[in-house]
Amino acid sequence: DKNTSEQGAWFENFIKRIFLTSPIYKEIYENVWTWAEFPYNGGRHDYGIDLVAKIKDLEEYYAIQCKFYEDEYSVSKRDVDTFLTASGKPFYIDGIPVRYAGRIIVSTTDKWTKTANDIIEGQIPAVTRIRLKDLKEVGIDWNSVLVNDLSSMKKAQKKVPLPHQEVAISKVLEGFRTVDRGKLIMACGTGKTYTALKVVEAITKGDGNVLFLVPSISLLNQTLLEWVKECNYDYQVYAVCSDSKVTKSRNESIEDLTDTIVPATTDAERLVEEYTKLWNISDKKVIRFFFSTYQSIEVISKFQKITGMEFDVTICDEAHRTTGVTLAGADESNFVKVHDNSFIFSKKRLYMTATPRIYADESK
């Protein structure tokens, strides 16, 4: 029975602990402070900045707001205004102004009003949302958490491949011995994404570059979450989305960059900068995972042309979309570009789907 400010303080520490424990976030952030602990708070009041997180190995800081609400509550513009203003201003390290590299709003509700949605879109520095549905999936063993002792929090246990997945893994690896392109066809719900990760681990042996292409941001989030939770090697994660809204197929909602579960990059130069910085300081073996929407494939292509980096394997999810058969008027060209090795340099390509497209002879 805590009062509201005690609840708020508990929730901030709860989120801080998630950032330091979750396999997704602890690989990205090397330190997380409450505002009171933040060494550069300048003795100022928090004005809505509840936590500050420092990116691993880089002098980049993220401002975080933690919103502890009923799950039916809708986050409003008024709820985020103060935070947006405060985090738009610099803080000082040894008298030198430093701007936040990005901003994150964590909430225990999935609901946002239209005005609140509109206000966080296209902000500089960018705003990312982590909502209740995302928190549930960040790789925490929720049964381990004791409300009065947050240090009890543990990572969720990793899975082991099921017999049908073992068969799929060995068949794909066998195929790749003689050819550089293959298909992985598995029914929905049988663990395609997980199976693909185990294929990637076997190919890279913990050291390499992997591109995973998806048609939507929600699939990008799902895949990224699953892969970093289940990966048995050290990894670095890069999320790439296009600047414009990533639209999905008809009848589905338009998604936005604010919904990527880790901060996403929208341009090739920024991606090169991020990759090069980490490449220069990291001497340990890692798998570098690049998660991208098909709509942003241009960014990946430019990035490769600048760095000369080649992917060891590229995974095309929902691969039936890459056949070039389009709905009337739909722009599917981004989906087809992945086949072209002069556009995306990759030693191997794996096309994944639950629904392969089959053509009658006359349509070939």
Locate predicted features:
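Catalytic P-loop NTPase motifs of RecA-like helicase/translocase cores
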Residues: E72, L220, R321-V325, I358-Y359
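Interdomain helical connector at the RecA1-RecA2 junction of SF1/SF2 helicase-like NTPases
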Residues: K348, D361-K364
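Conserved RecA-like helicase motor-core motifs
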Residues: E27-V32, Y233-K248, I261-P263
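Conserved Walker A/P-loop ATP-binding site and its immediately adjacent core
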Residues: G208-C231, Y238-S249, S296
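SF2 helicase catalytic motif II
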Residues: I306-L350
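ATP-dependent helicase/translocase motor core
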Residues: I18, Y25-E27, P39-G42, L84-T190, ...
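Conserved helix/coil segment N-terminal to the catalytic DExD/H
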Residues: V272-F289, T293-E310
